[in-house]
Amino acid sequence: METARGRVLSVASECVPLLKTGGLADVVGALPGALAAEGWEMRVLMPCYRPLRWRLEQMEEVFSEEDLFGGRGRVMAGEVAGRRMLLLDAPHLYDREGGPYAGPWGDWGDNAQRFAALSWIAARIAREGLSDGWRPEVLHAHDWQAGFAPAYLAYWGSGGVRSVLTVHNIAFQGWAPAALLPSLRLPASEFHPAALEYYGGLSSLKAGLVTADHITTVSPTYACELMRPEFGMGLQGVIAARAGQVSGILNGVDTDIWSPEAEERPYTARSLKAKAENRAVLSGAFKLDVPGPLAILVSRLTYQKGIDLIPEVLPDFIAAGGGLAVLGTGDAALEGAMRELEVRFSGRVGVRIGYDEGLSHLMFAGGDAVLVPSRFEPCGLTQMYGLRYGAIPVVALTGGLADTIINANPAALTAGCATGLTFHPTEPPAFAEALRRLIHLYADHALWEKVQKNAMRHPVGWQTSAAAYAALYRELVA
């Protein structure tokens, strides 16, 4: 590994392996190791929630502030699973029963202050450095929870530190009432539409978008989509105005954890024999007997994920010989719809409501195809798992799905480069046609195996993404 050329402070609300509620944690946890290979040292700063407090005994204090939005805060440093982690210990903000963003009765009422505190400390560390002498050259903020960090650098002085904001999902914008402006240590002079003001209030995400030196999203297509009203969710004008400082960098997946070679019945692109064994085990687990392609659906069961389309397209797919195994949780109505399909198509549809990491591995190992009919998908990891395991992705043409799947049209099949099936628009007729194409492709064994092997050889690790981030950091600090 090269000697570190630069230092980056990554600021986020969650990080694997400490805490995870979604894909954000996977990305934040994977980047330090991937960037180390590119010669960059990244430390991650996140809140010390109640379930993490036991770790403080094994850490050392490297920064503090006596009045951090209502109480004392200190930054504790230590090694966690090979990562240099920084935990913001502020019990008045984070030591409480419940999740990182919400308690038993909904979102925490002081979320604006809780995550402004995270951003404030991040900006101070960037300007002043830690007591162990470490100081970053780049502050990399993730989503609304860290959106104020670039703003604090811009308004209170950056000390030469450059800032990056990554938008993982623009649907979550960190809105707060304008009355909080002074208590959040934001300048009243910047409360106008070109800066902090957002529909009469504040948005930490918008604050980051207008002040960061560079903006990234988690796929090139999503970067373009965010400048359009149907995807920008009110912020499309802000992003379009900064188009020259916006880029899309695809996420990767942990190819050590998500590896068909590491499963109980291992297989590779060179030899797919054991994939059939995994299919048999998967069929047994869901009590299925499927003559055609066995598709899987591993997803949150929500409208955004296009799950409402499944009941409309599934009958024809079942009639043509297909089957479906479902693993997920979400909207009660959609959970009910999945259960109804299981009853209606007994032996061809199996449903598990909830999430089980081990079962998800079996589903990718045994599934012939994975369905990802999302209406919008900033990046998406599910289709990458499908590629890795030779479970052919059938995806809507949006966001990161469009950037990762090579559609099995006649030209791509002739050229021998197809890796999946895409459809557009995200509506039942187009989805149903993609499933018909899946049936026909599956019937041609030689062609099907060729597409499977193409998919499994498609690079989905972090190397390419890390190289892109490293190049961006180098450009910013040059």
Curated annotation (Swiss-Prot):
HAMAP family: Glycogen_synth. It is an enzyme of class 2 (transferase). The gene is glgA. Pathway: Glycan biosynthesis; glycogen biosynthesis. Belongs to the glycosyltransferase 1 family. Bacterial/plant glycogen synthase subfamily. Keywords: Glycogen biosynthesis, Glycosyltransferase, Transferase. It catalyses: [(1->4)-alpha-D-glucosyl](n) + ADP-alpha-D-glucose = [(1->4)-alpha-D-glucosyl](n+1) + ADP + H(+). GO terms for biological process: glycogen biosynthetic process. GO terms for cellular component: cytosol. Gene3D superfamilies: Glycogen Phosphorylase B. Synthesizes alpha-1,4-glucan chains using ADP-glucose. It comes from Cereibacter sphaeroides (strain ATCC 17025 / ATH 2.4.3) (Rhodobacter sphaeroides). This is Glycogen synthase. GO terms for molecular function: alpha-1,4-glucan glucosyltransferase (ADP-glucose donor) activity; alpha-1,4-glucan glucosyltransferase (UDP-glucose donor) activity. CDD domains: GT5_Glycogen_synthase_DULL1-like. ADP-alpha-D-glucose binds at K20. Its EC number is 2.4.1.21. The keyword Glycosyltransferase applies.
